[in-house]
Amino acid sequence: MREKAKLKVARRFRKNLTEPELWLWLRLRDRCEGDPVFRRQHPIGPYILDFYCPQAKLCIEVDGADHTRDARIIRDATRDAWLAEKGIRTYRIYAGDVIEDADEAANGMVLVALERIAARR
């Protein structure tokens, strides 16, 4: 997909977040001073990441039930490997966990990002 077309798709995704993605985004965008910055529906290479923290080189993916199917597992592994080659770690969180406690899920994402930032220094 060309960069311009991918950016257009990412913009459309930003306007149509899933419910768990929206709940996380509302918490991540209202971060405290000193917390890492996250981008939503961030295009990188051939992919669009649910959330991306550039300081931590951390991709956060919110996985629904479809991510347990064999074909999707293989696609996710291929994507994770491609990102790892670029130095980007993928952290996957189940959508049901976000629905159960979005605050805890968002805090967990921030902690993972902070740990990764500290380890990169």
Where are the regions that the model predicts?
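Nucleic-acid endo/exonuclease domains
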Residues: 1-121
